Amino acid sequence: MRLRPLLGAAAGAALLLLTGATAAPATADPATAVPAPYEAVTVDRVGRIATDGTVTLSGTYRCQSSSGPVFVSSSVSQGVSTIRYGTGGTRAVCDGAEHRWVNKGRPVPGSLVPGAAHVEATLMELGAFSGLLPRFHAVQGQTVTLTRG
């Protein structure tokens, strides 16, 4: 085994650690800081499972402005499963006012049952500024109760 590459790697790692340790964190001056626009998405505490298996999730959202189309997307999972089921998307209006969203989707039959579930809602923009990459305005994860009906 050659010692020179190992010494070079160790010296480089030490240099990075020492440089990072002396860097001061950036802080904003409260007098000149511009507040971020108020953007949020919420999830209602109850979701519905229809007799045909369609899941309906809902909540509210608020966003200030956008340069491209904005959507509220949602997904649901249940139990210890790592599988998340998408429940569609709603086109959002970014005018600073609070709006309702309702998404419906039909996951694999029998995959969701009445009871506790975890829902994640995302307020996401698709714009020319990012190519194909989305810009996330807000994300909310919440435990909900799925009911029949």
For every predicted segment, state its role:
Residues 129-149:
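Short beta-strand elements
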Residues 77-87:
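Short aromatic-acidic-glycine turn motif
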Residues 121-131:
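Enriched for extracellular/lumenal, surface-exposed ectodomains of secreted and cell-surface proteins
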Residues 1-29:
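Secretory targeting and sorting signals
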Residues 51, 90-100:
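Short proline/glycine- and polar residue-rich coil/turn motifs
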